[in-house]
Design a protein with these regions (language model features):
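Short secondary-structure boundary segments
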Residues: 1-2, 56
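Active-site loop signature of alpha/beta-hydrolase-fold enzymes
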Residues: 5
Length: 221
């Protein structure tokens, strides 16, 4: 998966990463990061991949059970540059649709962010049934292994709780919305069947157009 995807796999774009992987391994390769239509599928096949994986495209589907208020935030995200990677949620890199909560985190002091993380950790502990003894054990284990990981341990509950707010409770302003950059290029929700059929049709059309150019002598492809 290239950097265009969820942002947790590094900064190398798919167009650079994919040919490296295809040349390096002897197993089927499925490309991910930045794919949402037939043109991307055809490009991935041309690079040598056997197919593509899509997260954001299928998330933005009418078959999805995500509340409509949250899906509307995805559809309305039109600026690719604003769908940025952030470390503020749980200390790990992830790409997200901008919203009020992220804007607040960016302006908050480290102490405020820690207080918010502790509050979410308490909710996570209550929902998962984790005992206080188990929570303390995890905390002290992190402290022994790496004092710097304590903050990471405290923040670990942020992502699932904030995703719950937006993806389950339907409150996109107070949660987080993970996304690939292609969210800015998807103008409407569609069923999974429509998405797949549209990708196949477009890929075939683009392949036919390339073949026509080659047959007409307009290219050395």
């Amino acid at each position: 998966q290239g950097a265009e995807g969820g942002g947790h796999t590094g900064s190398v774009p798919t167009s650079v990463l994919l040919p490296q992987v295809v040349d390096a391994v002897k197993v089927p390769v499925v490309a991910a990061g930045g794919f949402f239509d037939g043109r991307g599928l055809l490009a991935a096949l041309a690079y040598g991949a056997q197919g593509i994986a899509m997260g954001t495209r299928f998330l933005m589907s009418t078959d999805n059970k995500v509340p409509r208020a949250t899906l509307e935030r995805y559809v309305n995200a039109k600026d690719v540059e604003k769908i940025q990677v952030s470390y503020l949620v749980d200390g790990m890199p992830q790409r997200m649709i901008p919203n009020e909560y992220l804007a607040m985190l960016e302006k908050a002091s480290p102490l405020t962010r820690l207080r918010l993380a502790l509050r979410l950790a308490q909710r996570y502990k209550a929902q998962t049934g984790m005992t206080s003894a188990h929570a303390l054990k995890v905390f002290w284990q992190g402290l022994r292994e790496d004092a710097g990981s304590v903050a990471q341990t405290v923040m670990a509950a942020n992502a699932p709780m904030l995703l719950q707010r937006s993806m389950i409770e339907g409150n996109p302003a107070e949660g987080v919305m993970a996304a690939g950059q292609v969210a800015a290029l998807i103008n409407r929700l569609a069923s999974c069947q429509e998405i797949i059929d549209g990708i196949i049709t477009q890929a075939r059309e683009r392949r036919a157009a390339l073949m026509a150019i080659s047959a007409a002598g307009g290219s050395h492809v």
